[in-house]
A protein has these predicted regions:
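Pair of pore-lining "gating" transmembrane helices in MFS-fold secondary transporters
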Residues: 127-144, 234
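Cytoplasmic helix-loop-helix junction between adjacent transmembrane helices
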Residues: 15, 21-62
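Helix-loop-helix hairpin linking two adjacent transmembrane segments in secondary transporters
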Residues: 46-47, 54-102
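Paired small-residue
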Residues: 4-8, 16-24, 227-232
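A late C-terminal transmembrane helix in Major Facilitator Superfamily
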Residues: 249-285
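Helix-to-loop junctions at the C-terminal end of transmembrane segments
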Residues: 180-194
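Juxtamembrane intracellular "pre-TM" segments in multi-pass secondary transporters
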Residues: 103-134
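Helix-breaking motifs and short loop linkers at transmembrane-helix boundaries and internal kinks
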Residues: 11-17, 214-215
Length: 324
């Protein structure tokens, strides 16, 4: 489906065909995300699952940062259709790798599902623990989407960066997210998932403080410098890298026998909730940086609410595999 959608986009002759092709690509990406996340849940648990989810989320979050840079270079060199032909070839490569190396991960006792699992979705959504951690992911994604949406105006209009400089700053932050994700994955075995959630929450708060400090304590000219925006964003993105792996593993942990359904629901809450939070922030009639600071503060609050100090000892021990 992804290759078909990419080829349709490359061959599009009108807006309807182009938008339809992008929708087809979106559906196929959702399917692959569910497979990846449910496969991790099938094979791993505890800190190992958190490390794998952290890597997956780090990879997912680097794409919005690097895609404009790579796509822009391809489009400038070969025309606007070139990025979509590249995606079609990339999809073919991934298909070959799946056929060669991806085994079946589903446990033998997986619950069979016929049709749309609406009842399963509703039952999982009623689990307050699931919602706590799924909403942590939604908040982190909302922060990322808000940052991405506001960046062109803040960096190019206010800070005066050229398109190339903007792409480099964007790409550098993408590599930063991946680097912090790798670091978080390395230390999670030593400090545990609750500590990583706490670190992520504090980094979100630091990003919020940085934006507010720039808005209230610096002169207007200095406020528009690109680093005044990107340094707090870098802190918040580091917080995202620390939070999303543990939060995803906690959300999926009780659903070993229906990992696919739970993974799909985590993805839906993450993307839909993140998009709603981002749209709400951008709709506020205030300074864009202040909108982003509010989102960071909301993610900090959500992360703090998910920490074990706010749960009973018995429920936390049961839910987090003996606190690890």
């Amino acid at each position: 489906l992804y290759m078909l959608g990419a080829a349709m986009a490359a061959l599009a002759v009108d807006p309807v065909m182009f938008v339809s092709s992008r929708l087809l690509q979106g559906v196929s990406v959702c399917c692959t995300a569910v497979v990846a996340f449910s496969g991790v849940r099938d094979r791993l648990s505890g800190n190992e699952a958190a490390r794998a989810f952290g890597f997956l989320n780090g990879t997912l979050n680097i794409v919005p940062a690097l895609a404009p840079l790579l796509g822009g270079l391809l489009a400038e060199a070969f025309g606007w259709r070139a990025p979509f032909w590249f995606l079609a070839l990339y999809g073919l490569l991934v298909l070959v790798l799946i056929i060669m190396f991806l085994p079946e991960t589903r446990p033998a006792n997986t619950q069979p599902i016929n049709g749309l699992p609406i009842k399963n979705y509703l039952r999982i959504l009623r689990d307050s623990r699931f919602l706590v951690f799924a909403l942590v992911n939604a908040g982190a994604m909302g922060m990322a989407l808000t940052y991405v949406s506001l960046a062109p105006n803040v960096l190019m209009v206010d800070a005066g960066l050229s398109p190339l400089q903007f792409s480099l700053a964007f790409g550098a932050n993408g590599f930063w997210i991946m680097a912090v994700s790798f670091f978080a994955n390395r230390i999670i075995q030593k400090v545990g998932r609750p500590t990583c959630l706490m670190i992520g929450s504090l980094l979100m708060a630091l990003g919020c403080f940085g934006l507010l400090f720039g808005l209230t304590q610096l002169s207007v000219d200095v406020q528009h410098h690109w680093l005044v925006y990107m340094l707090p964003v870098a802190s918040a993105c580091a917080g995202l890298a620390f939070m999303m792996g543990p939060a995803t593993s906690y959300a999926l942990e009780p659903y070993a026998n229906e990992a696919g359904v739970a993974s799909a629901l985590v993805g839906f809450v993450q993307m839909a909730g993140g998009a709603a939070l981002g749209l709400l922030a951008m709709a506020l009639p205030i300074e864009p940086k202040l909108s982003l600071a509010i989102v960071m503060l909301a993610v900090y609050w959500r992360g703090k609410r998910a920490e074990p100090v706010n749960m009973s000892a018995a429920s936390w021990k049961k839910y987090t595999n003996n606190g690890k």
